[in-house]
Amino acid sequence: MGEGQEYEEVLGAKNITIEYEVDLIDQIWEDRPSLSKKPCFFLEDKYTGENVASKLKRVREKMAEYGATVHLIASLDDNAWLLNFRGDDIDFFPLVLDYVIVRKDSVDLYIDDSKLNDRIREEMAKNNVNIHPYNDIYEDAKKIGADEVALIDPMKMNYALYKSLPCKVVEGANPTILMKAIKNAVEIENIKNAELKDSIALTKFIYWVKKNYDKMEITELSASDKLTALRAEQEGYIRDSFEPLQAFGEHAAMMHYAPSKETDVVLKEGGMLLSDTGGGYYEGSTDITRTTVLGHITPELKKYYTAVYRAMQHLSAANFLYGNHGWSLDVLARQQSGI
């Protein structure tokens, strides 16, 4: 939205208007895939630690502070947190394509309702959440009364939806951003449980690699599949939390390298396997990186590994002063190796 406003200001000075209601790409993309139809699931209180009614109450209190009568939320993570449901519309993210309008006494949810199960429908009805077709959001936004005041987050709202509003607009960060960032006691305990489950799976994986790399052919891709399978053994596993990054040997020097059929290599004696992976569970998501040494490695590899470890250890112990940038802290990492 913010970028659109900037274009509007610059182009308006030259008498150029922005046509935001025409999707030119849609007109020429003949084989455009349809939107996801994957089902959603409700996240119960034992995982969230707070029910939908409580969250809506807190959001409405913040709306009142802004003097807002309606609040449009276009960010998927905020909507998922607010209404306590998750989905699988985006690879590796438990999110659902939707929009939400919070009003004083009701909520409008714009979503493909074929994704919703009975448990979600029950909870939505209990909290006076009205369900509408996903694509109706733009026309319905135009129908918001001119006497209403809409709270929107300019960093999380697209330009077309913003321009559809006929009422007064108050700009501010979505209240849900800070709310979901502050974890309650139930969430904290669940995060610990998710990390414990993930640690069990990763420990089994490292043991398996070390015991079998010289007895059977293990590649980067088959190692990824094995770790995913071990995570899936844990209760509450949903999916990997991002694309597994299994990098062996020189591949480990490449930032965010992910193996493919074209680049896949076999794990061998004398190398190191870098595993940057994560698991998604009902309790939370993990992101963990570990390096596994296969057999005996050269003094040179030991030197480089130790240098990286010492750099991270030193940097992690530093006090990050307000206003610091990454480049100003880089010296703390490099000085451990005299560079």
Segments predicted by a language model, with ranges:
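Active-site neighborhoods and metal-handling regions in enzymes and metal-associated proteins
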Residues: 1-339
